């Protein structure tokens, strides 16, 4: 690498150019996530019929613990690199070595703690799983700054391609191994191959090689920003994953697997849509943080498009949990249906709570984000632990109540940065959330009255009911109509730009 300013952010350009770039980026990443959802659902449908709740429970518990190591090895530095106005080649290389060093350190800690972890959950199979998952942490740590650079340069197509290819080959391997009777090792192998493909692919796509670590290269601003983001992410991660650990500790590894499959089934569409939305929103909004009018316009449009794309899926899951479980996991997982429905209720509010974090990160208000997280996430954890007194459904209820409470809390912190923006975010989100909850109630009512004779028929009836009620709301509710039209406008703009070469 010879370009001393290789990581300088692209210019914002004109409003139309940025709108098209954002729309194209959103379309590319959303389309990729749609493909990911299809692949993940296909893998889920097959693997759930080949593996047991205990198999899933083992990998879910270790995956949750490995996720902590993943956050530690990232330390918020990927977000720091994306958000910074300029990243020199030397800074990028130093950040790479910092991430890799942290990855090796915490992977080593996982290996050392494998025996105590297995003892805590009373299952010796966890020892091998923990040690192999540590390799995944190292592979991901190498790829951290390569992926950040691709995102920073708005190379969304390259990122999307890598994510799809890695997932497809990993899922294919897992299905083959599960079919041959490898049990939970099929899931471990999937994680390893997915990480390896992403590691190699991002390095090749990046087109640069890290220089040696140089002393004196300024990293303080990255470390300060990253540490605040990391603290917020760590608490957020704990609040989202403590339920799996609590389920395993209190009710055993199979119960943890049952709960985790319900949670992942609900989290899958949320993650696959909010992750690319955030990857597009953060660099775009960061470039607009000094232009209040354009910042708010892009923010509200992004929130609207995200909610109107995501919440119809949540509404169907909330209305038809038994049918969704039967189709996705099979009848042997029927006990997960009430858990799934409760989690879906919380997902309405969780989806609305992503845009406040965009505001705080894009404007550099990471201290504010940390203070919000220090209040909201411990609240979520307390509710989940308290709910565990009522069983697995109680854990899900604690999560749902926490999601409903933390949405307005997030807006209170945004209000300290941009008061008008917080108000508009709330009104915008309230329209989408309330409308889709009403749609879910209508879908559940129609399916209950018609009583279809199969899960697939019920899903078709539910989807048709959702479409009809959505159209009726657009006719009688102007705010709802504007949201639907905004989604359609974004899709149309993205299609208009689809013929242009991607960066």
Which residues fall in each region the model found?
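Interhelical loop/hinge segments that connect adjacent transmembrane helices in multipass membrane
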Residues: 2-18, 22, 157, 200-241, ...
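Membrane-proximal transmembrane or re-entrant/amphipathic helices at the cytosolic face
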Residues: 2-13, 412, 420-422, 441-503
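Membrane-interface junctions at transmembrane-helix termini in multi-pass inner-membrane proteins
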Residues: 80-89, 139-162, 185, 206, ...
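Specific pore-lining/lateral-gate transmembrane helices of multi-pass inner-membrane transport
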Residues: 83-99, 258-374
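N-terminal membrane topogenesis motif
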Residues: 1-41, 74, 79-82, 86-97, ...
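Transmembrane helical elements of multi-pass membrane transporters/channels
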Residues: 25-40, 187-190, 194, 198, ...
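Hydrophobic alpha-helical transmembrane segments
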Residues: 127-134, 162-208, 224-225, 261, ...
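Signature of the first transmembrane helix
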Residues: 3-6, 17-75, 101-116, 131-136, ...
């Amino acid at each position: 690498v010879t370009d001393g300013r290789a990581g300088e952010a692209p210019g914002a350009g004109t409003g139309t150019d940025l709108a098209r770039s954002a729309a194209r980026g959103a379309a590319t990443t959303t389309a990729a996530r749609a493909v990911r959802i299809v692949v993940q659902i296909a893998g889920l449908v097959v693997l759930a019929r080949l593996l047991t709740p205990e198999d899933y429970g083992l990998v879910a518990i270790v995956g949750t613990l490995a996720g902590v190591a993943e956050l530690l090895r990232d330390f918020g530095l990927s977000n720091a690199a994306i958000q910074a106005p300029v990243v020199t080649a030397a800074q990028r290389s130093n950040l790479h070595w910092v991430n890799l060093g942290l990855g090796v350190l915490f992977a080593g800690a996982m290996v050392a703690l494998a025996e105590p972890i297995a003892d805590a959950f009373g299952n010796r199979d966890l020892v091998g799983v923990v040690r192999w998952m540590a390799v995944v942490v190292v592979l991901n740590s190498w790829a951290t700054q390569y992926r950040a650079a691709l995102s920073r340069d708005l190379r969304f197509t390259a990122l999307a391609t890598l994510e799809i290819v890695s997932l497809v080959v990993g899922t294919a391997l897992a299905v083959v191994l599960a079919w041959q009777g490898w049990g939970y090792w099929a899931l471990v192998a999937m994680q390893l191959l997915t990480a390896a493909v992403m590691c190699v692919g991002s390095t090749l796509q990046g087109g640069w090689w890290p220089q040696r670590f140089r002393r004196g290269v300024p990293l303080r601003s990255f470390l300060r920003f990253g540490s605040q983001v990391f603290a917020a992410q760590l608490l957020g991660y704990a609040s989202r994953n403590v339920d799996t650990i609590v389920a395993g500790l209190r009710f055993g590894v199979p119960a943890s697997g049952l709960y985790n499959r319900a949670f992942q089934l609900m989290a899958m569409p949320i993650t696959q849509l909010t992750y690319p939305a955030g990857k597009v929103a953060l660099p775009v909004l960061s470039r607009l943080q000094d232009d209040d009018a354009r910042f708010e316009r892009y923010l509200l449009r992004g929130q609207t498009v995200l909610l109107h794309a995501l919440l119809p899926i949540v509404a169907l899951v909330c209305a038809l949990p038994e049918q969704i479980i039967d189709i996705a996991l099979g009848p042997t997982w029927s006990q997960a249906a009430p858990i799934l429905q409760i989690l879906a209720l919380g997902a309405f509010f969780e989806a609305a709570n992503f845009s406040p974090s965009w505001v705080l990160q894009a404007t550099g208000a990471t201290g504010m984000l940390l203070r919000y997280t220090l209040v909201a996430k411990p609240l979520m954890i307390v509710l989940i632990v308290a709910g565990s007194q009522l069983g697995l459904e109680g854990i899900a209820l604690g999560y749902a109540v926490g999601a409903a409470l933390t949405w307005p809390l997030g807006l209170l912190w945004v209000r300290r940065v941009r008061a008008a923006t917080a108000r508009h975010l709330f009104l915008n989100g309230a329209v989408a959330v309330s409308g889709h909850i009403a749609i879910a109630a209508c879908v559940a009512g129609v399916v209950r009255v018609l009583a279809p004779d199969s899960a697939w028929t019920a899903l078709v009836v539910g989807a048709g009911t959702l479409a009809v009620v959505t159209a009726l709301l657009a006719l009688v509710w102007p705010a709802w109509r504007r949201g639907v039209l905004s989604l359609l406008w974004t899709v149309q703009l993205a299609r208009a730009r689809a013929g242009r070469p991607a960066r």
